[in-house]
Curated annotation (Swiss-Prot):
InterPro entries (UniProt xref): Ribosomal_uS14, Ribosomal_uS14_bac/plastid, Ribosomal_uS14_CS
Subunit structure and binding partners: Part of the 30S ribosomal subunit. Contacts proteins S3 and S10.
Keywords: Ribonucleoprotein, Ribosomal protein, RNA-binding, rRNA-binding
Protein's UniProt name: Small ribosomal subunit protein uS14
The keyword RNA-binding is assigned to this record: yes
Signal peptide location: none
GO biological process, one term: translation
Native source species: Wolbachia pipientis subsp. Culex pipiens (strain wPip)
One GO MF term attached to the UniProt entry: structural constituent of ribosome
Biological function: Binds 16S rRNA, required for the assembly of 30S particles and may also be responsible for determining the conformation of the 16S rRNA at the A site.
Length: 102
């Protein structure tokens, strides 16, 4: 089980990312627009770095298990770590997943 503070920090980052998504996309489109002058593009880049919170970046979000908060071995399709997924599948609580045999 992960520390509750780490789970809360990740949830706060997800919320910040959603809150600043449009603003960040606007600034990135200005930065990548080759038709604009270098000064405007540089100004957009400095606003992106200085004005927006660091945790509002999507890259800082960590995929965590929905039940335990474990940061490693998380299957994106299920949102669960490998250990919890194995337990739930063995009890038949994940629909459509069966134990393989050949």
């Amino acid at each position: 089980m992960a520390k509750k503070s780490m789970i809360q920090k990740n949830l706060r980052r997800i919320k910040l990312c959603d809150q600043y998504r449009e603003r960040r996309e606007e600034l990135k489109s200005i930065m990548n627009n080759k038709d604009l002058s270098i000064a405007k593009r540089f100004a957009a880049q400095s606003k992106l770095i200085k004005k927006l919170p660091r945790d509002s970046s999507k890259i800082r979000i960590r995929n965590r298990c929905a039940l335990t908060g474990r940061p490693r071995g998380v299957y994106r399709k299920f949102g669960l770590c490998r250990i919890v997924l194995r337990d739930l599948c063995s009890f038949g609580q994940v629909p459509g997943v069966t134990k393989s045999s050949w």
